[in-house]
């Protein structure tokens, strides 16, 4: 409990409020007793628990709170008492006639606890015989076993009269202050997000005809509260709603109740309803309820989804919407009792739709806050005492049950619920998830859609679109209207992008401080990497006694005889060497690393092969002469090979630095292990391409090779970052792709993507012309055999998709919320070149992927800082897309040569995904940009951040000079993913390697493709003018 932060001011104000009111409660109690034992998660809405949350913001188990005239006493343990010290001091300075005392009890000292209990009973007895308690509260635990016998005996001994104070407590915390309103608003916003998730899952299940029960779907949504990936998406929006001095915390989010999903012909509109085990019925009405609480303040929302509804259902639902509007705007007024409101609503129904009055619910809601349903203030025909006040918060929930559709003769129900706060300027709905008829109606049977479309098709186009003008903006009136709509969409998109860029700039300034700048500018801090050849002289090989140069492979050492002594030089100290023959002698020159030498270590290399200290002395080179040319050649070859092996080993070590050792896979030894047979894997641990099987175990999945038992791939659920299903629609294979958080080893290879696939088509083509169909030279299109073959292939593809999707869902289900399945949206895809070849890139819910051709592309959208559309110029047929990540050390991702036809779509898609983008007419030099950004990110955002990219965003087709676009130098090279920003990854790499000369040589050979395209376009225009 060390992290508890109790609002002392609120605690004091609320204690004084309750202390001043409790004598006015029904039956006028002389004192109040609140005993809380162990926490009861099964019933979190008891009055004593609510009191703890209202006063302290937390539940203090094993605590006794007693209110008496002039004094409030809290008996609790020592650790809990420490958190109340600040409050005690506040009461001492200004008690307003109320004293607060904290009595500490020791859990191990039973006698001391009993003495405290007897003292508090004596204090209660002094106050009077009438004692107020929440009668329905029931708690258990060790504390209650100690307190209950003593309290029961005291009741008999002192003849205490116990009275229920629940109604009085309800009225005390009825009106919400600003902080409470903020907490309920956050909870309501979160309920909207979960309702959106629930509706997506429900519609997908109905559309795909999945066999899933109402309770199973409910559990799936309920588990999302533990999905940090999902919760992080809503964190920024919810943080902005927090009251002053309160930081949004995901741990304070919890379910008010388990999500409720009802379908079929059994409906329960009471708040105590729950999801049953019947199959989700994809026709008629589906009722869905979600309730989230934040910091223990509840919210609620219920929606009715209409699946292929009849006209009667739609009309009744429209009336339900009108009725809710009438209740909130006209009936929910301060000063009215619950009975007055309810009876007025019933009269309205009888007047407008009398046939529905008998199906109306028995109440239209209740107070909501620390309790989901305050039973002492329900808006029904019985509540004629409590009056509505400004500051009240209600769960307005009502509907019509046991309705019968005349068309289908089936039962259905309609229900709506929203969280509503009553402000001084009127009621405000806090749960804003859509409920309009068009948004909650889904037509999977096209007959109804066609009926609705036919009248619309016959609608006349107005002959005058611009007032009385007969001159139209376009030859076609429809075009003019379309242009107007497109301009409006463009304006909305630009406004959204402006807000996204402003948000990006603010977050950048908050994320980085002046201390984030590298202290040494662009220079990387270098250090000496220690190495050692031998610890003791006895470890030196015996064959060095011949005083010749030797190579010790085991110790990675060159042993050179100097003045009759073997001197070891570790291979890390060796730089390069040369061998020359002059006359009868062969000269072997060995060069060693040393500070200040020509062609030395780059400043970007972190690990130095020497200790650069002014106290150290270095040998830069040594030359050996021998008449035995063959031995010198052999020795030089051994030294060269040892250096290559050492360099290779060091590169492998750096490459595997981010590989994390996985826990062991726990095999499923109980029950039936789910498996997917006849699949192939990429990359494969085997040299031969053979079909195999993947199994789902307790904490992960395992691919088992059929060739060798020790050849397998184990993937833990905790290491899966993205689980993606790609249908075989439009492709030759169906895929389950797994993108990992941390790379794993497959043999000696590091892999971060594993893909299971199966070929979707096994149709063979008869190329000999001897088939029965080929005998008829002039056969008609639509030959029966051909049609049958096509239908069979479509059926196989559908079965294949269903099998792989089911297995992907099984993986997600087995992970217990750690993993969720994403599906690719082919309709939103576009062509591009992320690597060497043109591929089709497709988005999922959270990613942009290319899963057909290796190397695969998986870009997580939540990791993107900004997107840049490069080479957007008039006349060019394609452009490039660059993603910059929030982790500035991560290399940027390029998708090149995207057709210009996809430009508008990508702009809108990036905006919809809340990704700010900028437009450039040239390719920027990203290595320079990212290097300067990493040096001082705080200064980067102080200078405007990514605003330099927007210099040319407004006029996409302008021919501005490169200097006007960016302060950074433009690159004429083909952009590549920068895997590092240094020119030398290893100090041992030879300068004369020539591996970096390719780009320069390409520039010298001739013009690039952009220039050639411009010339070709110019030539075409010239030819057109001549014609």
Swiss-Prot record:
Its main location: nucleus. It comes from Candida glabrata (strain ATCC 2001 / BCRC 20586 / JCM 3761 / NBRC 0622 / NRRL Y-65 / CBS 138). PANTHER family: CDC68 RELATED (PTHR13980), FACT COMPLEX SUBUNIT SPT16 (PTHR13980:SF15). This is FACT complex subunit SPT16. Residues 1012-1027 have a biased composition (Basic and acidic residues). Pfam families: FACT-Spt16_Nlob (PF14826), Peptidase_M24 (PF00557), PH_SPT16 (PF24824), Rttp106-like_middle (PF08512), SPT16 (PF08644), SPT16_C (PF21091). Residues 953-992, 1000-1011 have a biased composition (Acidic residues). Residues 8-28, 82-102, 208-233, 484-507, 637-658 form a coiled coil. GO terms for molecular function: histone binding; histone chaperone activity; nucleosome binding. Residues 767-790, 952-1027 are annotated as: Disordered.
């Amino acid at each position: 409990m060390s992290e508890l932060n109790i609002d002392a001011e609120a605690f004091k104000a609320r204690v004084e409020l309750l202390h001043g009111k409790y004598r006015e409660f029904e039956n006028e109690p002389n004192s109040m007793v609140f005993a809380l034992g162990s926490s009861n998660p099964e019933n979190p809405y008891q009055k004593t628990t609510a009191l703890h949350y209202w006063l302290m913001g937390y539940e203090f188990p094993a605590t006794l709170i007693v209110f008496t005239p002039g004094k409030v006493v809290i008996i609790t343990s020592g650790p809990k008492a420490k958190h109340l010290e600040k409050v005690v001091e506040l009461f001492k300075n200004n008690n307003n006639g109320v004293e607060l005392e904290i009595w500490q009890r020791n859990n191990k000292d039973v006698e001391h606890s009993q003495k405290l209990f007897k003292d508090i009973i004596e204090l209660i007895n002094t106050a009077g015989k009438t004692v107020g308690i929440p009668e329905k509260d029931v708690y258990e635990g060790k504390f209650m076993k100690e307190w209950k016998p003593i309290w029961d005996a005291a009741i008999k001994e002192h003849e205490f009269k116990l009275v229920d104070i629940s109604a009085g407590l309800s009225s005390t915390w009825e009106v919400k202050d600003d902080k409470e309103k903020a907490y309920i608003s956050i909870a309501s916003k979160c309920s909207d997000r979960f309702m959106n998730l629930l509706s997506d899952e429900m519609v997908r299940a109905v559309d795909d005809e999945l066999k899933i029960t109402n309770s199973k779907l409910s559990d799936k949504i309920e588990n999302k509260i533990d999905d940090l990936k999902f919760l992080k998406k809503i964190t920024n929006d919810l943080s902005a709603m927090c009251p002053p001095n309160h930081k949004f915390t995901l741990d304070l989010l919890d379910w008010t109740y388990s999500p409720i999903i009802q379908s079929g012909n059994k409906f329960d509109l009471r708040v105590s309803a729950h999801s049953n085990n019947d199959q989700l019925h994809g026709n008629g009405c589906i009722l869905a309820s979600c309730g989230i609480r934040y910091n223990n303040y509840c919210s609620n929302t219920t929606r009715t989804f209409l699946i292929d509804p009849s006209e009667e259902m739609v009309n009744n639902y429209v009336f339900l919407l009108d009725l809710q509007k009438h209740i909130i705007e006209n009936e929910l007024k301060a000063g009215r009792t619950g009975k007055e409101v309810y009876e007025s609503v019933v009269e309205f129904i009888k007047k407008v739709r009398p046939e529905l009055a008998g199906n109306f619910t028995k109440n239209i809601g209740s107070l909501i806050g620390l309790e989901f349903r305050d039973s002492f203030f329900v808006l029904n025909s019985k509540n004629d005492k409590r009056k509505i006040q400004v500051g009240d918060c209600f769960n307005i929930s009502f509907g019509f049950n046991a309705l019968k559709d005349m068309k289908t003769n089936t039962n259905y129900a309609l229900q709506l619920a929203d969280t509503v706060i009553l402000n001084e300027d009127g009621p405000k709905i806090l749960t804003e998830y859509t409920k309009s008829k068009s948004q909650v109606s889904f037509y999977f049977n096209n007959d109804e859609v066609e009926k609705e479309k036919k009248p619309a098709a016959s609608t006349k186009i107005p002959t005058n679109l611009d007032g009385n003008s007969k001159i139209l903006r376009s030859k076609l009136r429809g075009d003019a209207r379309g242009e107007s709509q497109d301009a409006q969409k463009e304006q909305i998109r630009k406004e959204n992008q402006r807000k996204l860029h402003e948000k990006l700039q603010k977050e950048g300034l908050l994320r980085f401080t002046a201390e984030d700048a590298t202290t040494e500018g662009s220079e990387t801090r270098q250090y000496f990497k220690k190495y050692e050849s031998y610890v003791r002289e006895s470890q030196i090989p015996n064959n060095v006694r011949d005083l010749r140069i030797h190579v010790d492979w085991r110790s990675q050492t060159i042993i050179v005889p100097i003045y009759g002594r073997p001197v070891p030089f570790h291979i890390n100290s060796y730089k390069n060497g040369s061998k020359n023959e002059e006359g009868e002698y062969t000269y072997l020159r060995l060069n060693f690393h040393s500070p200040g030498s020509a062609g030395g270590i780059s400043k970007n290399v972190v690990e130095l092969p020497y200790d650069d200290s002014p106290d150290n002395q270095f040998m830069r080179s040594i030359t050996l002469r021998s008449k035995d040319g063959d031995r010198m050649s052999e020795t030089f070859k051994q030294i060269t090979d040892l250096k290559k092996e050492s360099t290779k080993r060091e590169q492998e070590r750096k490459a595997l630095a981010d590989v994390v050792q996985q826990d062991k896979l726990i095999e499923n030894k109980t029950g039936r292990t789910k498996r997917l047979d006849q699949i192939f894997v990429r990359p494969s641990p085997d040299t031969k391409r053979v079909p195999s099987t993947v199994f789902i175990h307790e904490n992960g999945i395992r691919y088992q090779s059929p060739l060798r038992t020790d050849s397998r791939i184990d993937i833990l659920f905790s290491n899966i970052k993205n689980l993606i299903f790609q249908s075989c629609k439009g492709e030759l294979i169906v895929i389950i792709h797994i993108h990992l958080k941390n790379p794993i080893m497959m043999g000696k290879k590091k892999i971060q993507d594993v893909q299971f696939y199966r070929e979707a088509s096994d149709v063979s083509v008869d190329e000999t012309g001897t088939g029965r169909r080929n005998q008829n030279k002039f056969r008609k299109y639509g030959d029966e055999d051909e049609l049958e073959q096509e239908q069979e292939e479509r059926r196989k593809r559908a079965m294949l998709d269903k099998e792989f999707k089911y297995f992907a869902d099984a993986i997600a289900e087995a992970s217990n919320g750690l993993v969720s399945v994403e599906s690719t949206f082919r309709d939103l895809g576009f062509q591009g070149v992320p690597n060497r070849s043109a591929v089709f890139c497709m988005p999922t819910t959270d990613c942009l992927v290319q899963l057909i051709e290796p190397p695969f592309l998986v870009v997580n959208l939540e990791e993107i800082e900004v997107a840049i559309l490069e080479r957007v110029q008039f006349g060019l047929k394609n452009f490039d897309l660059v993603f910059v990540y929030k982790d500035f050390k991560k290399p940027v991702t390029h998708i090149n040569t995207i057709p210009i036809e996809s430009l508008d779509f990508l702009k809108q898609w990036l905006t919809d995904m809340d990704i700010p983008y900028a437009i450039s007419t040239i390719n920027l030099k990203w290595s320079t940009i990212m290097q300067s950004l990493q040096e001082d990110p705080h200064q980067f955002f102080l200078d405007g951040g990514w605003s330099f990219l927007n210099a040319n965003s407004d006029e996409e087709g302008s021919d501005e000079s490169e200097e006007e676009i960016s302060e950074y130098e433009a690159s004429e090279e083909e952009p590549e993913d920068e895997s590092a920003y240094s020119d030398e990854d290893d100090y041992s790499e030879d300068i004369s390697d020539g591996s970096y000369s390719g780009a320069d040589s390409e520039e010298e050979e001739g013009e690039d493709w952009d220039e050639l395209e411009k010339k070709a376009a110019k030539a075409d225009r010239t030819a057109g003018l001549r014609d």
